[in-house]
Amino acid sequence: MSGLTIFSDQQPEKPLWQSHNAEEIQQQLTAIGVRFERWQADCELGENPQPEAVIAAYQHEIDRLVAENGYKSWDVISMRPDNPQREALREKFLSEHTHGEDEVRFFVEGSGLFCLHLNEKVYQILCEKNDLLSVPADIPHWFDMGSAPNFTAIRVFDNPEGWIARSTGDNIADGYPRLA
């Protein structure tokens, strides 16, 4: 079940607010300019989905995002617990960073934890199947896929070159709860 936990950026041990209600999550995130919606990810993708099959299954949703926001490219990230690069990729995404463009993800299976750092707060968003999350450009954030990642998400970009991160150099992510 999707969830949102809000912390002070000075007190990672004490949540200020928490909910698993999609409407409440959407209200909180809309207030900070972040788009959160529940879409339908109802295509059967199989055990190890191929990117082309995922894109074909959800082309209508991709086209909708492109029409609304003028995005230029998209791809699929799919991680499984047996991926030999899972630890290195987890560490890469766990460092706080920003992008010069929106970070848009549509989870078509599994889950992951997006953590946003703004307005002296940390917003931990547990994204699950059916969740669309769009984080505006330049918001510091990190992503935790867990120690045994199991998710597939469509990533949509402004930049045809895809995912380009700029590290903030802040180690704030080290103090906050992570996925198991």
Swiss-Prot record:
Necessary cofactors: Fe(2+); Ni(2+)
Protein keywords: Amino-acid biosynthesis, Dioxygenase, Iron, Metal-binding, Methionine biosynthesis, Nickel, Oxidoreductase
Main EC class the enzyme belongs to: oxidoreductase
Cofactor: binding comment: Binds 1 Fe(2+) cation per monomer. Binds 1 nickel ion per monomer.
Binding-site positions, Fe(2+): H97, H99, E103, H141
HAMAP family according to UniProt: Salvage_MtnD
Site (Important to generate the dianion): residue numbering on this chain: R105
Reactions the enzyme catalyzes: 1,2-dihydroxy-5-(methylsulfanyl)pent-1-en-3-one + O2 = 3-(methylsulfanyl)propanoate + CO + formate + 2 H(+); 1,2-dihydroxy-5-(methylsulfanyl)pent-1-en-3-one + O2 = 4-methylsulfanyl-2-oxobutanoate + formate + 2 H(+)
EC number: 1.13.11.54, 1.13.11.53
Keyword hit for Mitochondrion: no
Record function comment: Catalyzes 2 different reactions between oxygen and the acireductone 1,2-dihydroxy-3-keto-5-methylthiopentene (DHK-MTPene) depending upon the metal bound in the active site. Fe-containing acireductone dioxygenase (Fe-ARD) produces formate and 2-keto-4-methylthiobutyrate (KMTB), the alpha-ketoacid precursor of methionine in the methionine recycle pathway. Ni-containing acireductone dioxygenase (Ni-ARD) produces methylthiopropionate, carbon monoxide and formate, and does not lie on the methionine recycle pathway.
Entry's Gene Ontology BP terms: L-methionine salvage from methylthioadenosine; L-methionine salvage from S-adenosylmethionine
Residues involved in Ni(2+) binding: H97, H99, E103, H141
Species annotation: Yersinia pestis (strain Pestoides F)
Residues carrying the site annotation May play a role in transmitting local conformational changes: D102
InterPro entries: ARD, ARD_bac, RmlC-like_jellyroll, RmlC_Cupin_sf
Family per record: Belongs to the acireductone dioxygenase (ARD) family.
Name of the protein: Acireductone dioxygenase
Site (May play a role in metal incorporation in vivo): E96
Involved pathway(s): Amino-acid biosynthesis; L-methionine biosynthesis via salvage pathway; L-methionine from S-methyl-5-thio-alpha-D-ribose 1-phosphate: step 5/6
SUPFAM superfamilies in alphabetical order: RmlC-like cupins
Subunit and interaction comment: Monomer.
GO molecular function, one term: acireductone dioxygenase [iron(II)-requiring] activity
